Amino acid sequence: MAIGSALSVGLIGLKAFIVQIQAFVSPGLPYFSIIGLPDTSLSEARERVKSACQASGFKWPETRVTVNLSPASMPKKGSSHDLAIAASVLSAAGAIAHDCLAGTIVLGEVNLDGTVLPINGLLPIMLHAREQGIATIIMPYANLDEARLVPDVKAIGVRHVGELIELMGGDADYRIPEATHAVNADVGATGMCPPPGDMSEVMGQHAAKWALEVAAAGGHHLMMTGPPGTGKTMLASRTPG
C-alpha cells in the first residue's frame, strides 16, 4: 500500500484555492475512483488519466486506486486537474519519487494518447500560487507564453505525460504524436487561439457592447449573467484583454 501526493489549483469564478490530490494504491479488485466533490468532467478523468499513463509506458496497477481531492467541501471542476491526478498515481505506484513534487503545482488536461492539453484560467491560478509562496508550476507547454505574465513563478512546460515522468526522474516510453506539433504551431506566439471575430460583427446587443467597451477601456471587472444562448461567450471572445 502506498500514497502519492500532488498539488493542483481549483477555481470558483476567479477565486482560486489549492487542491491537494492524494492517490492510494491498495490491494483489491482493479478499480479506479475519484472522490472529493468532482464534477462530471473531472470524474471522467479516470479514463483519460489511465489511458494517458499507459501511453507513457506506465503499467497501471492491477489493484484498487483511490484518488481524493482535498478540501472535500469545495467543488472541483474541469479537466485541469488531470495531470496532477496522474502524477499522484505515478508517485503512489513508485514510478516517480514521492518527494519530487513537494511544493510544486501540477496543471493540465491529458488526452488518451498522453498528450497534455492547454487549460483556461491560468493567470488567477498563478497569482494565487505566488500568494501562497509556491514558486514552481508544471503546466501544458502551450500555456508557457501566458505564464510569463506572472513574474517570480517558475513555469515548466510539458507536452506529454511521459515528459512529466522523465522530469521527475522516472523512466517513460512514449512518442508525441505529430498532430500535437501541428496544433501547437497553429496556436501562435501567445499560446492561445486568436479571437474568432470582431465586435463590429455583433448585431444588436448595444447595452452589452457598451458595458464591455467601458470595462475594457477602464480595466474594470465585469460579470455577464443570463441563460445559455444569449451571446455571453460570443461577446466575451470579441473583447480584448
Residue ranges and their predicted role:
Residues 1-234, 239-240:
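Peripheral, non-AAA+ core regions of ATP-driven protein-machinery
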